[in-house]
């Protein structure tokens, strides 16, 4: 099963790079590998490149907490959005003390969602759990972005898409960088991105193949005998 991240260790003092470029899920098979990747970093710097539409909230929250724990040991994390950081991926992006966003990238914040099956009591308990997770994520937005609870509640009330400039203004990003050409490893169709966001991932139309020049077909050669026959038929 392919993990939702790739890890590249760098020699010497160069930052290690962790690329999160898939939907976040199947956490039970990846938690140990993610932790092992962090524990194996010899550099004091880590760059986390993010291009994800989100996924399982507890998986992403686990990633965020591991990254913050790693940074709290006196190390430096830079998060860099390379396309989109949506849903729980937006929380992971906030794990960096330096948070870079190219000018044509986006973040999306919204409320926690989940499903449940069972009795009415089971459904009420599930709703209570969702509410508690919602508060936990709201507190992260408040703490890392420097906004108040009312603003965090407002942007989480619906799918709130933020441009890189808006992210800088609101404290989600700390630095804007030059625009990039983004590619998506996740399923763009299933992600249901707004058109202005999906355009980031659309490559320019490839130039059309040059029209091959065709030589005119040669005139049919009429043999004298054929010409005589034609005259007889007229």
Residue ranges and their predicted role:
Residues 1-88, 95-234:
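N-terminal organellar transit peptides
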């Amino acid at each position: 099963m392919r993990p939702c991240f790739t890890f590249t260790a760098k020699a010497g003092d160069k930052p290690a790079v962790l690329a999160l470029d898939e939907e976040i899920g199947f956490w039970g098979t990846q938690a140990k590998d993610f932790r092992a990747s962090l524990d194996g970093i010899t550099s004091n710097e880590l760059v986390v490149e993010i291009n994800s539409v989100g996924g399982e909230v507890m998986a992403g929250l686990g990633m965020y907490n591991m990254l913050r724990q790693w940074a709290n040991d006196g190390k430096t994390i830079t998060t860099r959005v390379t396309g989109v950081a949506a849903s729980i991926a937006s929380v992971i992006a906030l794990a960096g003390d330096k948070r870079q966003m190219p000018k044509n990238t986006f973040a999306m914040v919204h409320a926690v969602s989940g499903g449940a099956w069972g009795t009415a009591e089971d459904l009420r308990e599930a709703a209570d759990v969702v509410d508690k997770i919602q508060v936990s994520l709201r507190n992260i937005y408040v703490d890392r972005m420097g906004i108040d609870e009312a603003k965090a509640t407002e942007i989480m009330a619906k799918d709130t898409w933020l441009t890189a400039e808006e992210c800088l203004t609101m404290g989600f990003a700390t630095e804007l960088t030059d625009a990039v050409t983004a590619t998506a490893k996740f399923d763009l169709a299933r992600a249901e991105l707004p058109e202005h966001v999906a355009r980031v991932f659309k490559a320019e139309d490839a130039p059309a193949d040059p029209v091959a020049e065709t030589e005119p077909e040669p005139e049919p050669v009429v043999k004298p005998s054929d010409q005589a026959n034609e005259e007889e038929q007229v």
